[in-house]
């Protein structure tokens, strides 16, 4: 079968004999393509031509085994620098057309541009040495003549020379780091291109703010605890101070309370800044920023009918009346009144439970004291008092 016009199929054995001077990764897409065109991560490679001493060739390698790769003599392409990370590559006629190259790292882009310029100058001088050209201190635009030579198609390189794919763990980490740097540096276009590559390969990411974005810690969080079992008595509340970091999540705070005070996360309901907290959000997102910021912890009661197997040993259920037994007197928790055996029980004050955070509210409150949820329309104070 005849090779493509203006070129020839390269033998796989020739690849191993070429001395690779530098290989870099860049997001490549046709220059004339629309803004919705997908950029493909490709490897640019500059190597010495073993058949032409003192000459070099530029290779554009695809990802994955069996991919068709392109290479051109360096003197046959036109290479232009448009910005710190934006370059253009114009192959000779018969090639894929002008390509836009976006590098993930400005230093890597500068090093590549300097090497291409040095190799171009050395090739034009007709040097007989295959030694790498000297790297200059800075990159300058490179624009080379374009003689009518077509690109050469060649088979896939050896397995050891394949470019890293985003399916590789190392490549994923590098791309994730590049995405973080692009966002931190305000490079919207670079961040979009790296994100597109990650999305094409469906890489699972967890995007979180760094601790430097949050207020400094630790700080003392003033926590008021309420026990649902005895919400009408003075012994139903206690006040404690917890050392926390604003960047910690509510879930981490729940585990801290379980470790220090013994209440499992399943019975904890946190209200901070008039909001019922969700485990995934940070404390700072609810306004926790400095010493003395308040928080409210509402402790649910365990079900009346416990299972036959008993509570889990890892997360034991909080039983009614446990708040007074778990807190030492140093926390300022007043002892509950001990009614005489002959005294009649006092009538319960009518109250209503918030449907959002389950806080027990006074009967005359139109909304929840903790989270401002409106009182249920179906609540009847007379019926509540009679029960």
From Swiss-Prot:
It is found in: Cytoplasm, Cytosol; Synapse. Residues 122-132 have a biased composition (Polar residues). One of its GO terms (molecular function) is ubiquitin-protein transferase activity. Changing residue 272 to A: Abolishes interaction with RNF31 and ability to mediate linear polyubiquitination. GO terms for cellular component: cytosol; LUBAC complex; synapse. Pathway: Protein modification; protein ubiquitination. Component of the LUBAC complex which conjugates linear polyubiquitin chains in a head-to-tail manner to substrates and plays a key role in NF-kappa-B activation and regulation of inflammation. LUBAC conjugates linear polyubiquitin to IKBKG and RIPK1 and is involved in activation of the canonical NF-kappa-B and the JNK signaling pathways. Linear ubiquitination mediated by the LUBAC complex interferes with TNF-induced cell death and thereby prevents inflammation. This is Sharpin.
């Amino acid at each position: 079968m005849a090779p493509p016009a203006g070129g020839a199929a390269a033998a796989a054995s020739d690849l191993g004999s070429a001395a690779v001077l530098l290989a870099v990764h860049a997001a490549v897409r046709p220059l004339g393509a629309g803004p919705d065109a997908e950029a493909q991560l490709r490897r640019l490679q500059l190597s010495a031509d073993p058949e032409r001493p003192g000459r070099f060739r530029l290779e554009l390698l695809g990802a994955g085994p069996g991919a068709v790769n392109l290479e051109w003599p360096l003197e046959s392409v036109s290479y232009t620098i448009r910005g710190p990370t934006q370059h253009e590559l114009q192959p000779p006629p018969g090639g894929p057309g002008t390509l836009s190259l976006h590098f993930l790292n400005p230093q890597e882009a500068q090093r590549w541009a300097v090497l291409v310029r040095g190799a171009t100058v050395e090739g034009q001088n007709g040097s007989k040495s295959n030694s790498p050209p000297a790297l200059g201190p800075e990159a300058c635009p490179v624009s080379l003549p374009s003689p009518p030579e077509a690109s050469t198609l060649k088979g896939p390189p050896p397995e050891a020379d394949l470019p890293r794919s985003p399916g590789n763990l190392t490549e994923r980490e590098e791309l994730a780091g590049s995405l973080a740097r692009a966002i931190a540096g305000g490079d919207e276009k670079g961040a979009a291109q790296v994100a597109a590559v990650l999305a094409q390969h469906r890489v699972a990411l967890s995007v979180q703010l760094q601790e430097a974005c949050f207020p400094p810690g630790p700080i003392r969080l003033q926590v008021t605890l309420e026990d649902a079992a005895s919400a009408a008595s003075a012994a139903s509340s206690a006040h404690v101070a917890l050392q926390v970091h604003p960047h910690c999540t509510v879930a981490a705070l729940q585990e801290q309370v379980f470790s220090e005070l013994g209440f499992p996360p399943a019975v904890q309901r946190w209200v901070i800044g008039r909001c019922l907290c969700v485990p995934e959000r940070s404390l700072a997102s609810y306004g926790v920023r400095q010493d003395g910021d308040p928080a409210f912890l509402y402790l649910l009661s365990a079900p009346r009918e416990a299972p036959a197997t008993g509570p889990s040993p890892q997360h034991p259920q909080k039983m009614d009346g446990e708040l007074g037994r778990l807190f030492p007197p140093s926390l300022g928790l007043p002892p509950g009144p001990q009614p005489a055996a002959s005294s009649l029980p006092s009538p319960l004050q009518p109250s209503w439970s918030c449907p959002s955070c389950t806080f027990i509210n006074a009967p005359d409150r139109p909304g929840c004291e903790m989270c401002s949820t409106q009182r249920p329309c179906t609540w009847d104070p007379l019926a509540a008092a009679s029960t």
